[in-house]
Amino acid sequence: GSEMCKETGYADTAYKLLLQPDAPGWLYEVGKGATTVWETWTGIDENGKPHESLNHYSYGAICGWLFGGVCGIRYTDGALAIAPTPDKSLGWAKAAYDSPAGRIVSGWRYDGDAVTYEFEIPANLTADVTLPDGRKFTLAPGKHTV
């Protein structure tokens, strides 16, 4: 789904799917009052009648994509990599993950054409950061604005 779109260079397609108000699109469910992930894109028909499960994780990978794709948090076996994928259509995003090492925060915000990144790295951990423009660097523990 959305993660594959990012990894194959189609993050713009994943963002369109995220923000599209018609099915298939995540905002379709929200527009119909969803507070859970539905089994199908059109879990409620045009008359407001549910016809599939309205609490089903079949499309739940979107949550992982928001953390790992949009905000770029990847914490595995005590190592932290952050590679956010900002998109102007969303405007801003921020995610916090309570890892065994402590709270990890990654966020970004557009201001015109410029993107500002904010990261919070817990004590005793460093983060290898890769930005979309190709910059790569390591962050020490603490709060950082780039």
Stretches found by the model and what they are:
Residues 12-146:
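Non-catalytic C-terminal accessory modules of carbohydrate-active enzymes
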